[in-house]
């Protein structure tokens, strides 16, 4: 079964459970959280028990009598509670039990939203809960992690842009059927999921327009979305915040040495492609996801991800900065012939950030270095990193 392929988050989550009383496993709808807990994680944790609050009776009990609900899971280690945000009252009860017994690995709370005040969750479990984000599947996860030894081809790359990494959709071979699944995902997100935030007055039509613009707009900022949709800027901001809380959008802030406002990217290249996004936008999303997975599940401190926009409105699509201050800049290029002037934006960025490593990702056949810029094939995003050979431009 394609869903059952191993996930890179597994070993990291198991480590968190060894040291933290509560762990939150969070991610957008259909990224594979439930299967991850029920099957992959349960194989590693023989004393675990899984329950979902999608069941109305369980949800009511968890909300109205949370200690009674948790008593049924007393022998589980961990107690895995899916869609935990649907019972805000549960969080106070978890805090109460954890404060009495702080053994690590007692609870795993799964959620398709942030656990925040927007969901009427007052108790943040600060100091008691570790967080693990589950992203769409990476290229290596889709191909069985270490099972695939063949080098990544251009055709593999193009296929991944279109199919994305949502486990229940990416393996559907028929393009029409896959498109229907993507459309179902968009409709469920905009017609149902956003209305979980009962304190907010959210509009299905505006949410649908926002997803389309986040795929197609050159700079999907709040101001641009408000201008195109002719919606109130505050209303647009509220919708963007809600979609970010649902992990549907990833927000990228501008690098402090550049210009511009925050942009919003869809979480998955397949969804972006379905909504009309360009190949470059799909690669930007894939690059961000691959880097997020690589850094989020390591023992190092998380990286900060931004973009760079010059005064001439040219874009470096991703800036990755480590806690140590090390910076990597990635510009995505869509032409097979790379000339010296094409490197100028990255070189200008380095003048402002002298320690930055510069990467130009282009549809070239092999990598090379020129004047401090590494020109690399698109496929480099998904492969084990090797030093490119040197060559003139």
Where are these regions (language model features)?
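Dynamic helix-loop-helix/coil hinge segments at AAA+ ATPase domain boundaries and subdomain interfaces
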Residues: 1-10
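A cross-kingdom feature that marks ATP-driven nucleic-acid transaction machinery
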Residues: 2-3, 15-18, 23-24, 28-30, ...
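Short glycine-rich substrate-engagement loop in P-loop NTPases that contacts/grips substrate
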Residues: 48-78
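A short beta-strand-to-loop transition that corresponds to the Sensor-1 phosphate-sensing loop
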Residues: 110-114, 120, 136-137, 362-365
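Short regulatory helix/loop adjacent to the ATP-binding pocket of P-loop NTPases
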Residues: 115-130
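Interdomain hinge/linker elements that couple catalytic modules in large macromolecular machines
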Residues: 135-136, 140-282, 297, 303
């Amino acid at each position: 079964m394609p869903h059952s392929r191993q996930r890179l988050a597994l070993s990291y989550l198991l480590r968190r459970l060894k040291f933290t009383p509560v762990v939150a496993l969070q991610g957008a709808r259909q990224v594979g959280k439930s299967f991850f807990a029920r099957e992959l994680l349960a194989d590693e944790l023989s004393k675990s028990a899984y329950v979902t609050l999608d069941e109305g009776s369980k949800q009511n009990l968890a909300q109205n009598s949370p200690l009674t609900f948790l008593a049924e899971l007393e022998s589980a280690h961990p107690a895995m509670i899916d869609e935990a945000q649907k019972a805000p009252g549960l969080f106070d009860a978890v805090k109460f039990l954890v404060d009495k017994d702080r053994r690590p690995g007692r609870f795993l709370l799964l959620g398709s939203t942030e656990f925040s005040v927007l969901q009427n969750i007052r108790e943040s479990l600060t100091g008691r809960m570790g967080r693990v984000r589950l992203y769409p599947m990476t290229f290596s996860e889709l191909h069985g992690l270490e099972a695939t030894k063949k080098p990544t081809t251009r055709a593999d790359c193009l296929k991944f842009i279109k199919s994305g990494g949502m486990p229940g959709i990416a393996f559907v071979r028929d393009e029409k059927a896959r498109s229907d699944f993507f459309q179902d995902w968009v409709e469920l997100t905009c017609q149902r999921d956003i209305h979980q935030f009962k304190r907010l007055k959210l509009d299905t039509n505006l949410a649908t327009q926002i997803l389309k613009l986040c795929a197609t707009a050159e700079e999907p900022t709040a101001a641009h979305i408000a201008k195109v949709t002719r919606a109130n800027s505050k209303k647009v901001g509220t919708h963007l915040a809600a979609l970010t809380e649902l992990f549907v959008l990833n927000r990228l802030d501008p690098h402090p040495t550049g210009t511009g406002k925050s942009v919003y990217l869809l979480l998955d290249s397949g969804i972006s492609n379905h909504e009309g996004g360009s190949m470059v936008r799909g690669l930007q999303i894939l690059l961000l996801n691959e880097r997020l997975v690589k850094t989020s599940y390591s023992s190092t401190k998380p990286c900060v991800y931004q973009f760079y926009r010059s005064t001439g409105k040219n874009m470096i699509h991703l800036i990755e900065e480590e806690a140590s201050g090390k910076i990597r800049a990635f510009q995505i290029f869509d032409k097979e012939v790379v000339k010296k002037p094409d490197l100028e934006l990255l070189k200008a960025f380095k003048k402002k950030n002298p320690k930055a490593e510069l990467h130009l990702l282009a549809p070239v056949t092999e990598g090379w270095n020129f004047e401090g810029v590494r020109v690399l094939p698109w496929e480099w995003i998904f492969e084990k990193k090797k030093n490119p050979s040197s060559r003139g431009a």
